[in-house]
Amino acid sequence: MTDPLAELSAAGVSIWIDDISRDRLQTGNLAALIRDRHVVGVTTNPTIFGKAIEGSARYQDQLRDLAVRGVDVNEALRALTAYDVRWACDVTRPVFDATDGVDGRVSIEVDPRLAHDTEATIAEARALWWLVDRPNLFIKIPATVEGLPAIAQCLAEGISVNVTLIFSVKRYEQVIDAFFDGVERAIEAGHDLSRLASVASFFVSRVDTEVDKRLEKIGGEALQWKAKAAVANARLAYRTYEEKFATPRWQALAAKGARPQRPLWASTSTKDPSLPDTLYVTELVAPGTVNTMPESTLQAVYDHGVIRGDTIRGYYADAQATLDALATLGIDYDDVTDTLEREGVEKFEASWTELAAAVTRSLERARRERGR
């Protein structure tokens, strides 16, 4: 029997799981995914933590302890999420060691309410880096205009960064420049480049969701272009990756021991039930990439994914033709990606607010029970 996930790994794609929970950690499920499903990393976000904390009783003891200490909700949130991420870092540490720090990484996101505040994002990133205190940690920072200098500064301080919420190739170019800037400054500061790493999380399925919604309003022949924008956009991002990491600026950094910032495909579950559930995995295969998936997508690839080798390089002309055709139809690419960035931040802010409200209720309940 073939193993599509093994084939995906052999094609140069690092498979990460886009989920975390104390249940997954305590039952050994994450360790099993590493052992049996070729998973070599973990990503998290406020929505994932919200579902985990609301849906499990395994957080109650820590919540009671936090209530006794009288901490506020922000400190409680930081403690709860850092605990899980630190645990996940320990589970993935053998992968980190075996791959010389390339994989075995776990990501934790800064408070999304700080997405447009550079200095606050830097301060939060430092706090999380110190709190989790694991070499295989990534701090997730959104690729907003205000996030770009924060990304560079964190890297300059030796903090490994997962740049999130990238939707456009133009913003991706800016992210790579911020990465170069940060690594150059890290070298000047004498940081250990063997420990410093970064990935750039390029969001995929949401692009199709937004573009397809606009195509449906146009109707007619425009509908033939549905479900094509996201893969084309990601393929052109990989072309940018190849171009930027072939420049003399990068070659000078690589000569000093720097590692490239890998493209990471995020938002890879299909939102349209009419599409193949492995679409954003099998169509985005190329060496040196990461694909982070919810467990449902991971299992779908394992069950019936067809890995055809490299499905990115060699498709650049087709990808550009797709975006050109969409522009001819009146699809404003910049407006699409600006909308997605704004909505992406808003969604994570909303999830964080909901999570904070749930934790507040839990803290108050624990305090009432203690007072009886």
From Swiss-Prot:
Stretches of the chain forming a coiled coil according to its record: none
List the Pfam families.
TAL_FSA
Q: Could you tell me the EC number(s) of this protein?
A: 2.2.1.2
Tell me the Gene3D superfamilies matching this sequence. Answer: Aldolase class I
Query: Which keywords fit this entry according to its UniProt record?
Result: Cytoplasm, Pentose shunt, Schiff base, Transferase
Matching entries from PROSITE patterns are given as: TRANSALDOLASE_1
Q: Which GO terms describe its cellular component?
A: cytoplasm
Q: Example GO molecular function term?
A: transaldolase activity
Give the positions the UniProt entry annotates as the active site. 140 (schiff-base intermediate with substrate)
Which HAMAP family does the entry mention?
Transaldolase_2 (MF_00493)
- Annotated protein name in UniProt: Transaldolase
Which species is listed as the source?
Answer: Acidothermus cellulolyticus (strain ATCC 43068 / DSM 8971 / 11B)
Q: Which gene encodes it?
A: tal
